[in-house]
Amino acid sequence: MKRVIFTLLLALFAVTTTSAQKAVELKHTADQVVKHWNNQTAPHSNQETKDEYVNEKGYAFCTSQTEFYIYKPSTPKSDKCIIVLPGGGYSGVVMSKGFRIAEWLRDEGITSIVLKYRLPNYGHKEVPLEDTQAALRYAREHATELGIDPAKVGVLGGSAGGHLAAYVSTFTPDAEKPAFAILIYPVITGDSWLGHISSFNYLLGKNRTPEQVEQYSLQNRVTATTPPTILLLSDDDNVVPSINSMLYYKALKHYGVKSTMYTFPSGGHGWAGKAGFKYEKEWHHLLLDWLDTLK
């Protein structure tokens, strides 16, 4: 009898927890939200069977609906548009940090779109890529109403979002690639000693082959047509080692791609879009200055 009661209590707790997760809504100040496709209407599905939910920190999990959160400045100072790709280890999407970055960009007069992408769910690697490509197309197709130049749509991503930004930069046909890429402490390599293995577990699955690891270690995908790129990171990052950025930067330089890299002495991991980072003003200034160097 006690075992039955205990089981019922566990079930009740699970239902209550799930309901609480579903009840949390994303808090944002976007000027417009566009629901794009979902697992039923997109070219590919991530085969997610659980309900999508958001936790109290603004992290989205089990994502099955692609959404664009559009931030438009009241007084535009740039004709560029930045697709913001939040990180989360490919196990979640840290929307709250993406929103904070977009708010800062809006204050600087730059239009941005925060992408809630569908997660790869242990091996559906094409899903986050096609969502990012869809966001690029949307921005270009709606350039007039967004007040931007369709040839100046770039991407910004941190951590696994940085991998996604490099992913779309290196796996997309040249004519459709982003105009530029901003990589912040990005996951780049799937090497078991150097990379963030959890991200590769979610992206490629736990039974991935060495050939897949090599293909999706994105320093191996750089060519002369890879978009101009800036990398920002901290030297003491113990989540995604700085060697990830170094490998990508080395490949960019090898192929003559316009690129630069800034390494802060401290800060660890996850500081972009998070209050309290010692070098927040510095990375903001460095990024804005770099954007000004682009045509």
PLM region spans:
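Primarily recognizes the serine-hydrolase "nucleophile elbow" in alpha/beta-hydrolase
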Residues: A134-S199, V213
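Short beta-strand/loop motif that positions the catalytic acidic residue
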Residues: T225, L231-L233, D237
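Conserved alpha/beta-hydrolase "acid-adjacent" motif
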Residues: N238-N244
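C-terminal catalytic histidine-bearing segment of alpha/beta-hydrolase fold enzymes
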Residues: M246-K295
